[in-house]
Amino acid sequence: MANATTYRTCPRSGLQFEDQAEKLMKANAFVAVVWLLIGGLLAIGVVLTRWPALRWLEADTFYMVLTAHGINMLIFWIIFFEVAVLYFASSTLLRCRLATPRLAWLAFALMVIGSVVNNIAVFRGSS
């Protein structure tokens, strides 16, 4: 039983995007930007606390926010965006289909669940 693979040709670049890979690229890039936004908002808390005239957060809250900021900006944003780029490079530039799209979606779901659980642990103070 052969699976029919559908491709979309970009009108600007002429690149061919495989359907499942394109959806995974968009999903990973979107979640990456969400983590970047959350990390940027946490950076405001870090900066306002480091400003000597303001001292916005208490010490324990400051380090919790600093930890969440670092994890979101240095790990989650980079990893999700890197996966989006890898799907682009492996499927679009090499013109290949995804071998196991269901497994790829499972991996994406596990990445999202893991990153959310990690943030919950940090904000509960139990990390």
Predicted features and spans:
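Hydrophobic cores of alpha-helical transmembrane segments in multi-pass integral membrane proteins
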Residues: 2-11, 26-53, 60-96, 101-127
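N-terminal juxtamembrane segment and adjoining first transmembrane helix
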Residues: 13-27
